[in-house]
Amino acid sequence: SVGFKAGVKDYRLTYYTPDYETLATDILAAFRVTPQPGVPPEEAGAAVAAESSTGTWTTVWTDGLTSLDRYKGRCYHIEPVAGEENQYIAYVAYPLDLFEEGSVTNMFTSIVGNVFGFKALRALRLEDLRIPPAYSKTFQGPPHGIQVERDKLNKYGRPLLGCTIKPKLGLSAKNYGRAVYECLRGGLDFTKDDENVNSQPFMRWRDRFLFCTEAIYKAQAETGEIKGHYLNATAGTSEEMIKRAVCARELGVPIVMHDYLTGGFTANTSLAHYCRDNGLLLHIHRAMHAVIDRQRNHGIHFRVLAKALRMSGGDHIHSGTVVGKLEGERDVTLGFVDLLRDDFIEKDRSRGIYFTQDWVSMPGVLPVASGGIHVWHMPALTEIFGDDSVLQFG
């Protein structure tokens, strides 16, 4: 036998620390880990902690120039998933210093940047994150939040009503504005650009903005209520996106919209800052979420994407409908709806909430029930979501 061992080391030795007491400032993550056959769960959990913090596959001399104990992620608890073979929940604690302040982008690059392609894992899913106040306080959060939005709109004690203009692609700007007027005049609070309406050849963004603004002012004058249309500012560059938001502000409309996953968190945070500085509400659509959150055992659960959006900033976010879905889905959906709206959310595994989350004073986000709902769903929707929600039809 050879007298030395090749330098690939066991992660367990350094990164699996079952005795670790988590700090109030740590960012905590719950991963659903499916190890490859033959890989012990402790090694898989430790590998996740290592690869998403200070680890690399071997020992390098520069390790001696820093304090691993201060900067390493630690897998501090592992439990098997009930009813699933070879699946475990690995809990990982990250020291706060690993993250740039006020950057959701950096948080995700660190926590989910590399580990998902890891050989020792068959699959990996980020189920939940605990964001400590020490970190969340470095974010502005939603431009306005639920209470300020109600004050701006002068609408209280009920869900807000909206609808998406259809056909979503192909209408001219003038006919589009006409549909907006009819909906708002008929009693809706909001109408919405579809998520893929940006600035296509058949309807350029500025034409749409102008005709929709005309519709809003006409409907407001006739009803005596404040009306809005989610003008989609999503664009190919963040400069162009801000340009569209500036135009919306100059037109005096109340709200713009962004596709935050396709547009990206950096662009979204910039837009949220602009919206707060200029009194615009920000409606967030989650196009592309199912690419990331649909698989049970791999990807990122939507509750994490929802928490990230509350930090990055948005006043509304699409969050599923529950109606007509499975019962279990209902509790989980209501779990992340609470994470969006409330200040303090208790750990509750039955609702998929792995950690107690304290948002301190960060404004809340209105959940938007959207997608395949119609008027007969109203009683169920109001019962499920309560007053602080947007019911988005069409």
Curated annotation (Swiss-Prot):
Top-rank EC class of the record's enzyme: lyase
Domain of life of the organism encoding this protein: Eukaryota
Keyword Lipid metabolism: no
Binding positions (Mg(2+)): 192, 194-195
EC assignment: 4.1.1.39
Catalytic residue positions: 166 (proton acceptor), 285 (proton acceptor)
Compartments where located: Plastid, Chloroplast
Keywords recorded for this protein, A-Z: Calvin cycle, Carbon dioxide fixation, Chloroplast, Lyase, Magnesium, Metal-binding, Methylation, Monooxygenase, Oxidoreductase, Photorespiration, Photosynthesis, Plastid
Residues the UniProt record annotates as site (Transition state stabilizer): 325
Cofactor binding remark: Binds 1 Mg(2+) ion per subunit.
Sequence positions that bind substrate: 114, 164, 168, 286, 318, 370
Primary location recorded for the protein, binned into one broad class: plastid
Gene Ontology MF terms: magnesium ion binding; monooxygenase activity; ribulose-bisphosphate carboxylase activity
Listed cofactors: Mg(2+)
Modified residues (N6,N6,N6-trimethyllysine): 5
SUPFAM superfamilies: RuBisCo, C-terminal domain (SSF51649), RuBisCO, large subunit, small (N-terminal) domain (SSF54966)
Annotated positions of the N6-carboxylysine modification: 192
Catalytic activity reported: 2 (2R)-3-phosphoglycerate + 2 H(+) = D-ribulose 1,5-bisphosphate + CO2 + H2O; D-ribulose 1,5-bisphosphate + O2 = 2-phosphoglycolate + (2R)-3-phosphoglycerate + 2 H(+)
InterPro entries on file: RuBisCO (IPR033966), RuBisCo_large_chain_AS (IPR020878), RuBisCO_lsu_C (IPR000685), RuBisCO_lsu_C_sf (IPR036376), RuBisCO_lsu_fd_N (IPR017443), RuBisCO_lsu_N_sf (IPR036422)
GO cellular component: chloroplast
Entry similarity comment: Belongs to the RuBisCO large chain family. Type I subfamily.
Subunit structure of this chain's protein: Heterohexadecamer of 8 large chains and 8 small chains.
Function, in words: RuBisCO catalyzes two reactions: the carboxylation of D-ribulose 1,5-bisphosphate, the primary event in carbon dioxide fixation, as well as the oxidative fragmentation of the pentose substrate in the photorespiration process. Both reactions occur simultaneously and in competition at the same active site.
Other comment: The basic functional RuBisCO is composed of a large chain homodimer in a 'head-to-tail' conformation. In form I RuBisCO this homodimer is arranged in a barrel-like tetramer with the small subunits forming a tetrameric 'cap' on each end of the 'barrel'.
PANTHER family registered for this protein in UniProt: RIBULOSE BISPHOSPHATE CARBOXYLASE, RIBULOSE BISPHOSPHATE CARBOXYLASE LARGE CHAIN
Protein name: Ribulose bisphosphate carboxylase large chain
The organism of origin for this protein: Victoria cruziana (Santa Cruz water lily)
Underlying gene: rbcL
